[in-house]
Amino acid sequence: MRLTFAVFFTVWLAFPQANTTESLQPLLDDVSSAYAKLEPQTIRPAEGYFKYDYLIPAGFYKQMWDWDGFFIGSHLAHQSREQAKYLKWWVLNFAGAETTINKDGWVPGVLLADKLPVPKPSPILGWFTVKPFLAQGAVIASERLRDYQWVAPAWENLRRIVAYRERTQYDPKWELFFWETAMQSGEDNNVALTNDPKDRNAILAVDLCTFQLREYKAMARLAEMLGKKTEAREYQQKADKLRAAMLKHLWFAQDAMFFNVRRDTGEPVQRISGSNFVPLIEDILPPADARTMIRRYLWNPEYMLAPFGIRSLSKRDSSYNNVSMIDPYSNWQGPVWINTNYLYFLALKRCGFEGEAAQLAGILGRLVLADIHKWGSMHECYHAETGEGLAPTAEQSKDHAFPGFVGWNLLVQDMLQCEAKADCSRLDWPM
């Protein structure tokens, strides 16, 4: 029966549905109506150490996070010029933390309004240094606001944050970047990384290298717009160097796959995880190779494609599961996550898979709408095979009530707007 379904599912996905743009408009309308009630939960007024209004995932999470805030703020900026201020303020709140902490550019990836972070590693998280999204957020906000000058007072903060990452997460031998732990990556238990305290800083990571490449390009853009020509050239050269190193060391042509690589041996970590596909949002591969990677793995039910979105780990992997968990790790070993599905959506669009991108937007739209109708909010991840919301649950919450989740799930609206309105111009910033 499984084989029969897999064959049917593959054939169905091979043919884009007719009148996709027209058919997604009612779904967009319903999702937009539901999100109008949930979106305000992600915005908190300035307080404590935060000089500006700040962004939170809402529900289970009350803190300001790095990539959560980036995705939420990007969504808000996509919706209107007025709301781009929240992405701007997210950047400035993190930049302000760099000044307040005063630790040579170190800023953690999560901040609290009422408690200054202690500059020392934790047993589980390690140093948990902020991910490379701040400059990208600054560019998206600046483009939407039509104003780059607000970045000038925070420019040196951004420079120090980038320099800290170069000192602590860059391997000059390989000319590539590594995560300290899987937790730092945001994909808490990603099997292509490790949380072993005896094996920290061990794995050169394709997703981090891609994010850092884009961060370099964003820094170059900011420098150019601020009239800093020498610094603009510096960051563009670093981006070009990093791209070349990724192709040399992380791309395995015989497998048509990017793999993480161990720093000590140079051996690939041959696990097909969702993070392997992040480079497809950038022009790193020749187009033909990128399309091969998508056809063979990303849009293939035997690997990444599931009935309810794109999995976080290949179905063929021995660790594949859809267990509901949130503490100490959320589950990135199978469930569907909206933020990474948004990246896959961008990759599909970039590589010319228009019908597949529209189908993915529709699948995710129906997924979150069903969740909202049942629970009044959403979950942070979903069972890839059944569409069931996984975490957080009432049992995982301190007060034993369903807390919900909003956060980056708002990006479903952006994907549907791109398809239903045939306007994707704001989903990526100018390179």
Residue ranges of predicted features:
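Active-site core of glycosidic bond-cleaving carbohydrate-active enzymes
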Residues: 25-30, 56-96, 156-159, 206-225, ...
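The substrate-binding groove and active-site-proximal loops of carbohydrate-active enzymes
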Residues: 71, 77, 117-124, 142-152
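The feature captures the catalytic groove of carbohydrate-active enzymes
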Residues: 56-59, 63, 102-133, 139-143, ...
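Hydrophobic h-region of N-terminal signal peptides that target proteins for export
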Residues: 9-16
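Catalytic cores of carbohydrate-active enzymes
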Residues: 20-31, 41-47, 166-178, 213-289, ...
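Active-site acid/base region of carbohydrate-active enzymes
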Residues: 21-40, 44, 94-103, 142-206, ...
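Terminal, non-catalytic domain-edge segments
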Residues: 399-431
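Sec-dependent signal peptide recognition
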Residues: 1-7
